[in-house]
Amino acid sequence: MITLTELKCLADAQSSYHILKPWWDVFWYYITLIMLLVAVLAGALQLTQSRVLCCLPCKVEFDNQCAVPWDLLKGSENASSNSGLLLPLPLRIQNDLHRQQYSYIDAVCYEKQLHWFAKFFPYLVLLHTLIFAACSNFWLHYPSTSSRLEHFVSILHKCFDSPWTTRALSETVAEQSVRPLKLSKSKTLLSTSGGSADIDASKQSLPYPQPGLESPGIESPTSSVLDKKEGEQAKAIFEKVKRFRLHVEQRDIIYRVYLKQIIVKVILFVLIITYVPYFLSYITLEIDCSIDVQAFTGYKRYQCVYSLAEIFKVLASFYVILVMLYGLTSSYSLWWMLRSSLKQYSFEALREKSNYSDIPDVKNDFAFILHLADQYDPLYSKRFSIFLSEVSENKLKQINLNNEWTVERLKSKLVKNSQDKVELHLFMLNGLPDNVFELTEMEVLSLELIPEVKLPAAVAQLVNLRELHVYHSSLVVDHPALAFLEENLRILRLKFTEMGKIPRWVFHLKNLKELYLSGCVLPEQLSSLHLEGFQDLKNLRTLYLKSSLSRIPQVVTDLLPSLQKLSLDNEGSKLVVLNNLKKMVNLKSLELLSCDLERIPHSIFSLNNLHELDLKENNLKTVEEIISFQHLPSLSCLKLWHNNIAYIPAQIGALSNLEQLFLGHNNIESLPLQLFLCTKLHYLDLSYNHLTFIPEEIQYLTNLQYFAVTNNNIEMLPDGLFQCKKLQCLLLGRNSLTDLSPLVGELSNLTHLELTGNYLETLPVELEGCQSLKRSCLIVEDSLLNSLPLPVAERLQTCLDKC
């Protein structure tokens, strides 16, 4: 037998799902319990009470009905007097029935004559109740829905109990209490100083978000910081909410299952209300039982009594009332689901009241679950929404970040870079720790692979900050921070992971002198938008661009006329149009790297103030235009390295002011004698070519300090090379030298000598005369050092070890 506890479990879901049950689900639950009690009571009465009592056998039948003998006799006399006939009375067997015969008749009449509704009424009530209970709890146990609901309830309880939720709600209450005070203060300021109001209004017009600043005289009630454990727990909840939302918002299976449950309930309600009242009239107290058992008892018809008829009528009527209440609430819930947009849930009201204005609206099953939770208690959705807000998550990340990155840990990251500046390099963090602004000695701040960085007003504490590097990171600058950067920042390096637009705050850095942009999008045609931006960078002197362009952007040539250095790395894409270079008359240094240039652009020859030209990693095969460089009287540095140049034109001798010449990594086989007319040369790089000899005329380069012919095919060095007394760096590695002239000892200023990769067998003793040569700067095989006489080797070793 099914116990009451087991029946209760069928009608009630797990208690953990109570927050997902609206008031009608609770109402259904209690009605279902009462229905179960009705079914159990009716079943118990039917099992314990006598079913049918057949105590009165019918001895006389008249007109196919049971009649009392004298009534039958009176009727017969009337009939005979009218017809004139005398009907004989039927004869019957006169004997009493045994108790076993009565029991037999009871059983036969119960099975054959009692209406089926009266017999199965308790079971029908039980069946209906079980169907109602199953429909109410099916969505809680169906695998596709129960897993999502269980996950949601688990997360919701964690959100409700998290200290971060309490902190966030407290911040909202605190800010709402502070706002009236701020408004009253602002009205007072507006009434007393109209000029300052205009200034504030102009600042508000900038297209950047205002920072959330607290009033100095009011202490925030949420100033307490979460400990590390609580912060990690809140962080885990944020991740769970993200994954849950991504998973649940894709489908609406919970909504559809819940809707189908209610539709089944309404259909069952209509069915019960239709047939139960109709068959209720078949439950009668008296039953006329006509059965063919006359051979056993002597009677054919019996007058029976169904003792449970009246109480079953009462229970059935009460059951109908319960079903009507159940059906009406089911109809209301169906109307609620069809009327409302339950697949969309908006936090608009909450966004207006709280300081988390970025709480997103949700859809599908996620929205439906929140609607159900609102029917139970709207506070659950409010607390849950805290973990949907990116602003809230960023605040938590900031707190966790501050706990992890203390001042001591940040100070240990400070280093001196190659420019002898104090630099802090932060890599792959969740944000910018607040303790960074305590490092007042920092000069360079480098941020790499940090998804969201916000520079608050506290950046003004970095009084020595002059350089900012932002690599593959998103940087948002507050107004007070922007004002500080405008006055102090001199160098800015921006590198984007994907092609992106230049942040608007860059154009407000009026004192910026060097700007390095990698992976940004610059329009090739001038527009009013960029006209308003670039023209404010009046102090910009150096611009580095790394992108794929077909022409030099017009915003650079037209809006930055005072630019002195322009570097363009085109990443191998062909740079077609260069005519607009003529406008940059103040340019002193020009770098066109990886632009797939086949010839030297003629527009370069109009840059009269040009000092340095770098055409590295292009596709230059000939440089016949080199004669035109004589129109650039200030040109002192020419870099044509990493190309496919086969020869140097004789006209190079016209570049009398040339001081540095880079021709490495080409296909040059010989040097023209006119090259040595460039007597001002002090840096000459001819490494990685196909040279076989060096002309004796190199002696005319009396100012030569750096000479590199690494990785060539040179077999002998001219004596004229050793007449370059100012030579400091001599790179002769990976050639075919078999002998080093003793004249090398005359290079008293030599500090760096490379000889490795040749066919030398000994080193000249005269190396001892190179007083400035250090051991770390002598690149030679150890076996050659051992070939020197011992006194010379020891003396040279002693001199070299002083480095």
From Swiss-Prot:
- Put simply, this protein is called Volume-regulated anion channel subunit LRRC8B
**Which transformation does this protein catalyse, written as a reaction?**
chloride(in) = chloride(out); iodide(out) = iodide(in); taurine(out) = taurine(in)
Where is it chiefly localized? membrane
Topological relation to the membrane, as annotated: Multi-pass membrane protein
Q: Which GO terms describe its biological process?
A: monoatomic anion transmembrane transport
UniProt function note: Non-essential component of the volume-regulated anion channel (VRAC, also named VSOAC channel), an anion channel required to maintain a constant cell volume in response to extracellular or intracellular osmotic changes. The VRAC channel conducts iodide better than chloride and can also conduct organic osmolytes like taurine. Channel activity requires LRRC8A plus at least one other family member (LRRC8B, LRRC8C, LRRC8D or LRRC8E); channel characteristics depend on the precise subunit composition.
In Gene Ontology terms, what is one molecular function of this protein? volume-sensitive anion channel activity
A GO cellular component annotated for this chain's UniProt record is: endoplasmic reticulum membrane
Q: Kindly indicate whether the keyword Cell inner membrane belongs to this entry.
A: no
Q: Which UniProt keywords apply?
A: Cell membrane, Disulfide bond, Endoplasmic reticulum, Glycoprotein, Ion channel, Ion transport, Leucine-rich repeat, Membrane, Phosphoprotein, Repeat, Transmembrane, Transmembrane helix, Transport
LRR repeat segments run 415-439, 440-462, 464-486, 488-509, 511-532, 539-559, 562-582, 586-607, 609-630, 634-655, 657-678, 680-701, 703-724, 726-747, 749-771
Organism domain of life: Eukaryota
Outline which residue ranges sit on the Extracellular face. Answer: 47-119, 283-307
Q: Span of the secretion signal?
A: none
Disulfide cysteine pairs (residue numbers): 55-304, 109-289
Q: Which residues lie on this side of the membrane: Cytoplasmic?
A: 1-25, 141-261, 329-803
Tell me how this protein assembles: Heterohexamer; oligomerizes with other LRRC8 proteins (LRRC8A, LRRC8C, LRRC8D and/or LRRC8E) to form a heterohexamer. In vivo, the subunit composition may depend primarily on expression levels, and heterooligomeric channels containing various proportions of the different LRRC8 proteins may coexist.
Record-linked PANTHER family? AGAP008170-PA (PTHR45712), INSULIN-LIKE GROWTH FACTOR-BINDING PROTEIN COMPLEX ACID LABILE SUBUNIT (PTHR45712:SF22)
